[in-house]
Amino acid sequence: MNWLILSNKLRMRQGLALLATLACLTILLSACGAETNVKKGDQFYAIGEYFDASAEYKKAYSRTAIKDKPKRAERAWKLAECYRHINYNAKAAGAYQNALRYHYPDSLALLYLAQAQQRQGDYKNALKNYEAYLELVPGDQLATNGRLGCLQAPMWKKKPTLYTIKKEPVLNGRRSDYSPALFGDEWDQLYITTTRPQIESGEISGITGIKSADIWVSKKDEKGKWEQPTSVEGGLNSEYEEGACCFSPDGRTMYLTRCTFDAEYPRYAEIYTSTRSDASWSTPQRLQISKDTQSSYAHPAVSPDGKWLYFVSDMPGGMG
């Protein structure tokens, strides 16, 4: 009998030891997995693939022990930064709150949280966080402007203007539609940039998590009403991302933005040109603005006389 009792106790101890070993291995594997996710996320983030980076940081955050507050804070911050870049404001606000809850040391988390809340119309909490940030960084212009906006927005809502802004149902799809540009002798064509599911590009953007954009066009019918947009004919659109176009004064040249793909390098935006012939647009050709190959050039706009080309860029010498 004593032998049986001792045998059972021994088995219990062995079982407990096995469970403890398995628990330690699980924690170790989870920690290793989290580090792998962070490294992958950092690689995606470095080339501007914010959506793909967010997926890795989210996994890393969930695999990090709650008691490991510094790492939880850092991974929540990285996740929030991804969401901020792609305008996922609700998710960004939640991630910044997690970073602050685990005492992330950079006060910018408080500022960015306030901005994300303001974009959602949560003026009360945004105001509170702007004021908290201003206590840490007195006189900061972004926080000062944000605070003022939160104070003014409720008053503006009580005193609406004489103008009514509404969505145009024919021109908008289920995804983003933006950068409209009128075209034609009678301005009866409207070119838009769209990410709707029907576009030609089959690739899901690692930046946004949706399809890469193409340029579509809508035309007015005999009654002067806009028709459903369709993809631009010719060789304008490709497997890459095209959008944000404008036209030369004579209507013969289109200036557009294109972002090509490279798994190893950031997606640098470049300006291309396309010429119109027989009611269709040619395959775009890159417009060399500078020998700088490490900067982006996008969102072109041509002056009325056709002599000046305005664009946005992150090239050295700017203020952004």
Task: Annotate each predicted stretch with a short phrase.
Residues A60, N98-A99, A132-Y133:
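Canonical positions in the second alpha-helix
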Residues I47, H85, Y112, R119-G320:
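Short, conserved micro-motifs composed of acidic
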Residues V38-K39, P70-K78, L108-Y112, K128, ...:
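Alpha-solenoid helical repeat scaffolds
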